[in-house]
Amino acid sequence: MPLRPFIPLHPVERAEQPKRAASRCSTCALRTVCMPPDLSPDDFARVDAMICTTRHVRRGETLFRPGDTFNSIYAVRTGSFKTIVMHRDGDEQITGFQIVGESLGLGGVYTGHHNGEAIALEDSTVCIIPFGQLEQMCREVRPMQHHVYQMMGGEIVRESSQMLLLGTMTAEQRVAAFLLNLSSRFKARGYSAAEFVLRMTRDEIGEYLGMKLETVSRMLSKFQRKGLVAAQGKQIQIVDSEGLRQI
């Protein structure tokens, strides 16, 4: 029985086709983070043809807003972002912080429109991945298909972890879990797991963790007194990671 022709759910129109930029996935230092490790040279050539442009987003600028048409997902190449959803009463809720090598915009797959907002925490760069082309490649390249499944599964795990964090943990446990989570993500990208800079404000951390700025500051001060962390401004040093895990 012949296969029916594949029609992508999110086709990329000709006018949306980006012009080629100098950056290439095949030579990017982050390719082991963003891409499957077992792509062939021919597959990487296809990826280079697909992800052929980047976008610079200055600190405080928005990458996408609620209601924007979903055409692409984004991979953070440099910098960092926060994602926000708006409640019906107009209040905002920070739902995550994305660092180098992580994706943005996957939620738009569901309705064809972005349901939240992504704002740069610092001057940042993203790689633009047209989702219609990615769908086609996933159908033909099994490692890429599996990688996209992993990305979507990771989003589900992240959201369920946040629900657990907000629903069952004490304020002390929330801040400890937040620092350990950042530490492991930086380590996975080849950065120091023990020393890093918090690009978000303590007020933003509190909004994400469901607590006030003063509570975040009080918990960090408590960790310093216990010798678990050293903090100077936004610079964080994890002195005793095992101690943080035991909180």
Predicted regions and their residues:
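Cyclic nucleotide-binding regulatory module and flanking cytosolic helices
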Residues: 2-59, 103-104, 108-110
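Glycine- and acidic-residue-biased ligand/ion/polar-headgroup-sensing regions
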Residues: 60, 71-84, 99-101
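Short phosphate-coordinating micro-motif centered on Lys-Gly-acidic
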Residues: 62-68
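Local beta-strand/beta-hairpin segments that build beta-sheet-rich folds
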Residues: 63, 95-96
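Short alpha-helix-to-loop micro-motif enriched in aromatics/charged/Gly
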Residues: 88-95
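Cyclic-nucleotide recognition modules
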Residues: 96-161
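Polybasic "coupling" helices that flank or enter modular domains
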Residues: 139-212
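Phosphate-/nucleic-acid-contacting segments
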Residues: 184-247
